[in-house]
């Protein structure tokens, strides 16, 4: 029986082929992670010229800092809202394509447009619409007696950054959900319809289980997106305010490292965030993926 393993004339060729990826991984991932871990154990002067080993003192100080703990729980809430809302809304719009006969191409194009917008631009767009004095949406809300001012109301500020972040990510999720739904054999849907199953029952009993692998992939991607890629949205929309109500871990790392020049604390926070993402990823692959059945 012939082996399917590719054979190379030179034993060095496989290493040469993977070398670019290994170099990129070392330079842009492993090296920065190692530097962050090293600085998290040091007391560094603001300009980084001198340092002193302090062990775990930075982490002890971190977990006794009420502002950091607030940012930690804000990150958990924000990431949960963005991930769950983004997946549910995108899946809903992807499922609607099945019932749109006229203008389906226009509808699909419209759903993909937000992905072409930069995160900071998306934040500015919704800031204009939710502007307390001149915003179209705030004017509409005022007609119903609702006063909107996200610069002073922490709940409204959180809603704004979650809404803008979800809107920016909808296109990405929609594309994968739509492709997954289109890959489901029509014969299964038609057989269920003949047996008397309605649209909702067909979706939950047939479509949803079959797109579980895609849903799991998007769950991981959206969680990473909520932790890291929403930084421009928060920076442009609220700058972490009001009163740190929208300050997530990634934004706090930036503010303390680049504005406050506290390199040791910023590095310690980076290590904690890295560890948190690793733990959540392991939990997802260990427990969530075990429920997924790949066809």
Swiss-Prot record:
The keyword Glycoprotein does not apply. GO terms for biological process: transmembrane transport. InterPro entries: MetI-like, MetI-like_sf, UgpAE/MalFG_permease. Keywords: Cell inner membrane, Cell membrane, Membrane, Transmembrane, Transmembrane helix, Transport. Residues 33-80, 131-156, 229-262 are periplasmic. It is a multi-pass membrane protein. Residues 76-284 form the ABC transmembrane type-1 domain. Its main location: membrane. It comes from the Bacteria. It is found in: Cell inner membrane. GO terms for cellular component: plasma membrane. Residues 1-11, 102-109, 178-207, 284-295 are cytoplasmic. The chain crosses the membrane at residues 12-32, 81-101, 110-130, 157-177, 208-228, 263-283. CDD domains: TM_PBP2 (cd06261). Part of the ABC transporter complex UgpBAEC involved in sn-glycerol-3-phosphate (G3P) import. Probably responsible for the translocation of the substrate across the membrane. The complex is composed of two ATP-binding proteins (UgpC), two transmembrane proteins (UgpA and UgpE) and a solute-binding protein (UgpB). Belongs to the binding-protein-dependent transport system permease family. UgpAE subfamily. This is sn-glycerol-3-phosphate transport system permease protein UgpA. It comes from Escherichia coli O6:H1 (strain CFT073 / ATCC 700928 / UPEC).
